[in-house]
């Protein structure tokens, strides 16, 4: 996507950057360059060092040694304010907005001459096709819209170096295309973009160059056109991976507790004409031992439905039947006791206590069930069981959840849900922002859970993920399910997209 072969001095040149945490080398002499008008994609497994490198460039974290050259000027260390002044803006994977401020206030926060910025903000909103009510509270937005607000904050600051950390993780294909169109306009003005993503098709579409990090080093770097997909995947995950959980992992993953066993195919969760905030007249059945996909565009009402099932939102009409009994009036805790468990979309704000220990987080739901009191030895043993089952990487049980990479945080959250002995497991965007390796681990895990006759409701914006994982698929459009479940050959990206966009005519698969 580079607009010209003639390039001036690099916008950014990181040289021999080292960083260590608690005696562990996180970055080992990294060299990284970004030119004007180019997209440089940065890939790597969870814990490879991508986020640490970007935080150093953005002035959030100091390097132990090394230099940053910004448009020809050398710096040993930056602060966030200085980085902003130099035109560097990091759009984080987990949006950092003020939930009690309006969308407009969040976008304009920290800017001078706010009145002069209003027209620019409106122009950006129009260019990206955003339909925000600027006076709404940021806390009311879903993850995809919060991500877009963060990107707008960066664009409002006339950033010359824009770092996008998984910017499309929760965006629909249409929203992604609008974003890419806007990024192309920025590239034409000489802006350079560091694009962190695990989606190889998107990277091939937008990136001029690719660098792959592994274990704190640059394992592979080159022009996108010269690197094969096999080269990239091999650089990210050099070890040969098993296609399914090992026998040992399956042994450690046997779900705890006296969970009622249902024969595969037994209806476990039934929704009858459910109406609530963001959805209406939703009916479906979820069976033991199946993975039921719930697809739809962002804003279709999927997360609102999931939160209502778990008791986090008020049900306005209809019935929720769990094992043949209505649970409409039960609290979240009572639903949890009956085996209804929810893995939320936003792991950092809703799923984990980032300042609590890993052992505490894994056992958090069972703490509540037994009176909140933690038992350290038992919790540590539980964490060790899931470490072996899920291949979670950490140093000690007492370390805070925030110290883990995104993929390992997600595995801790999954372990937390499994420890509650689910009969029904609702997973909302379970692979958002995790790398290829961790994504495969999670897929294997969900299949293993379903094989134990747990009923799994998989909510995902990744239609290829839905196609790969789901036994049946319902598609929500503007808060409703207007079609019967897709099955077998009907489960494909094209058909799902058609229904998601409200196409009343879908092609039935021929027998």
Swiss-Prot record:
UniProt GO MF annotations: ATP binding; ATP hydrolysis activity
One Pfam short name: ABC_tran
PANTHER family, per database record: AUTOINDUCER 2 IMPORT ATP-BINDING PROTEIN LSRA, CARBOHYDRATE TRANSPORT ATP-BINDING PROTEIN MG119-RELATED
Ligand binding (ATP): 44-51
The keyword Cell inner membrane is annotated on this UniProt entry: yes
Organism: Escherichia coli (strain K12)
Subcellular location: Cell inner membrane
Membrane topology field: Peripheral membrane protein
Protein role: Part of the ABC transporter complex LsrABCD involved in autoinducer 2 (AI-2) import. Responsible for energy coupling to the transport system.
Domain (ABC transporter): residue spans on this chain: 12-240, 240-503
UniProt family annotation: Belongs to the ABC transporter superfamily. AI-2 autoinducer porter (TC 3.A.1.2.8) family.
Enzyme Commission identifier(s): 7.6.2.13
Assigned GO CC terms: ATP-binding cassette (ABC) transporter complex, substrate-binding subunit-containing; membrane
UniProt name for this protein: Autoinducer 2 import ATP-binding protein LsrA
This protein's encoding gene: lsrA
Catalytic activity: ATP + H2O + (2R,4S)-2-methyl-2,3,3,4-tetrahydroxytetrahydrofuran-[AI-2-binding protein]Side 1 = ADP + phosphate + (2R,4S)-2-methyl-2,3,3,4-tetrahydroxytetrahydrofuranSide 2 + [AI-2-binding protein]Side 1
Protein's UniProt keywords contain Ribosomal protein: no
Inducing factors: In the absence of AI-2, repressed by LsrR. Induced by AI-2, via release of the LsrR repressor. In the absence of glucose, induced by cAMP-CRP by direct binding to the upstream region of the lsr promoter.
